[in-house]
Amino acid sequence: MLTFTTLASGSSGNAALVSCGDTHVLLDAGISARRITTGLKSLGVDPAELSAILITHEHRDHVSGLAVLTKKIRPTIYAAPATCGQLADQLPHGAELLQSRLPGAGFAVGELWVEPFATPHDAAGSVGYVLSGGGRTMALC
């Protein structure tokens, strides 16, 4: 079953968990790594078992916890090319985890099919994601 749980939402930080079976994907990491790991654990998800992190854009309220989080866990981080370029300089312990994906270029993450799509925003390379799994589909941005 495909599930979505908000860990935080708003101008002070954004992070959410999307799960399908044993696949767990973090959407944005705009809160502290401690809040992310505490939130995941409260949902019964070991942070080390995250399948991937999907980043919508490089603004602080979407990535502020990413640098510390990637010191502790090592999931692949997917983002649009422009966002990957911005994040590479901010992730001294995680730049090698970045995987660039163009809007419209779908890819698999465990039991999920992920398709990025362009979104209008003042951040270069801003994307949302359509996630499909377990017979369900959701769009997030």
Say what each PLM segment does.
Residues 81-135:
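Metallo-beta-lactamase
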Residues 8, 29-31, 58, 82, ...:
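Active-site metal-binding loops of divalent metal-dependent hydrolases
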Residues 33-79:
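Active-site metal-binding motif and surrounding structural segment of the metallo-beta-lactamase
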Residues 5-16, 52-66, 71, 84-88, ...:
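Structured catalytic core of nucleotide-sugar glycosyltransferases
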Residues 21, 70-71, 92:
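Short glycine-enriched loop/turn motifs at secondary-structure junctions
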